[in-house]
């Protein structure tokens, strides 16, 4: 399969910004992060556009993924509708501004509220793509499938760099199943995650799906069973700290994210117990 996209990778968390070319449109995903990096993306878009409509898709509303929108004022902006729930995107934009302020980052454009052209509710075909809500990391996360290229841009999941960061573990498992079905049906041959390098080929994609699913199942088992059996929180937390990802101990630099997953699962388990 000939590569039909250009991938830009920020030095901040290896955040990816994909530009996917189709006959009538240019699709830009999550332009990130620092001004010089976004300027490079903008120059590429300008050189490749050739009169085509520019579609800017936000895979989700986390601050490192939305900060570059203002650099592309004539783009049609698309996101999943949950991005507007409970002032979510406003909070994330403010977080981006605080980050920039802390490191004296100056931008040539305003980091402001995007003007959305389309808000996606359910899975749907649109033009030459298929939008698929994949909540779990965030409520508003959305994957985009380019059917002809068999290319799936997923946002913050299926990364080679990190285990699942959980907002809703049940929804996350369901989202993995949605993507797995697409792969098994032969509709996806390459996945671009929000951080890290793409997964190419059925075997690699399914491996990433399975290791993420196993982490979620193991994590849920420790916490949900512990809460159901009235095990002391300290004991459950100690068991949780011993969990592995893909057979390897959790990296120290990701330990805080692992702990945040534990806290989220405690909330879910307590809510389920009632």
Stretches with model-predicted labels:
Residues 1-49, 143-156:
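Conserved beta-strand hairpin/beta-sheet module of binuclear metal-dependent hydrolase folds
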Residues 225-274:
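C-terminal regulatory/interaction regions
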Residues 29-32, 53-64, 78-81, 133-136, ...:
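Active-site neighborhood of phospho(di)ester-bond hydrolases with catalytic His/Asp-centered motifs
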Residues 33, 91, 163-167, 204-205:
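Short, solvent-exposed loop/turn segments at secondary-structure boundaries
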